C-alpha cells in the first residue's frame, strides 16, 4: 500500500509541477497572441486610413476638375430682363434701365458696359 501511496504522490507532484509550467507557458503564449493581435489591428488601421486618404484624394481631384472645366454659372444674356437687386448678367454686361420705358415688361435689362 505504501508503494501505491508513494507512486500516487509522485504522480501528483509531477502533474502539479508540469501544470504550473503549462500555466506559465500559456500566459506567455497568450501575451504573444495579444501582441500579435495588436500589431494586426495597427496594420489594419493603417491600411484603412490609407484607403480613406486615397478615396479623399480622388474626390478632391474630381472637385478640382469640375472647378477647372466648369463654365460660368447661369447668367442672363444681353437684352434679357434682370433684377436690380440681384443682377445675374453675364460678364461684360450690366443691369440697367432701358432707354424706352413702358415697352418692356420689366424695368431693368442686361446691356453691354
UniProtKB/Swiss-Prot annotation:
Residues annotated as signal peptide: 1-21
Disulfide bond annotation, renumbered to this chain: 75-90, 82-95, 89-110
GO MF term set: sodium channel inhibitor activity; toxin activity
Keyword Signal recorded: yes
Keywords on record: Disulfide bond, Ion channel impairing toxin, Knottin, Secreted, Signal, Toxin
Keyword hit for Protein transport: no
Propeptide residue range(s): 22-74
Matches recorded under Pfam families: Toxin_22 (PF08092)
GO cellular component, one term: extracellular region
Tissues with expression: Expressed by the venom gland.
Subcellular location: Secreted
Family: Belongs to the neurotoxin 14 (magi-1) family. 01 (HNTX-16) subfamily.
Entry text on domains: The presence of a 'disulfide through disulfide knot' structurally defines this protein as a knottin.
Function: Probable ion channel inhibitor.
Name under which the protein is recorded: U11-theraphotoxin-Hhn1d
Amino acid at each position: 500500500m505504501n508503494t501505491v501511496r508513494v507512486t500516487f504522490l509522485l504522480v501528483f507532484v509531477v502533474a502539479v509541477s508540469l501544470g504550473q509550467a503549462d500555466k506559465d507557458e500559456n500566459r506567455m503564449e497568450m501575451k504573444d497572441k495579444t501582441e500579435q493581435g495588436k500589431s494586426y489591428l495597427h496594420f489594419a488601421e493603417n491600411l484603412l486610413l490609407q484607403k480613406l486618404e486615397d478615396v479623399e484624394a480622388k474626390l478632391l481631384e474630381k472637385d478640382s476638375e469640375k472647378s477647372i472645366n466648369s463654365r460660368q454659372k447661369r447668367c442672363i444674356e444681353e437684352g434679357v430682363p434682370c433684377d436690380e437687386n440681384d443682377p445675374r448678367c453675364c460678364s461684360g454686361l450690366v443691369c440697367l434701365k432701358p432707354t424706352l420705358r413702358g415697352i418692356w415688361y420689366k424695368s431693368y435689362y442686361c446691356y453691354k458696359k
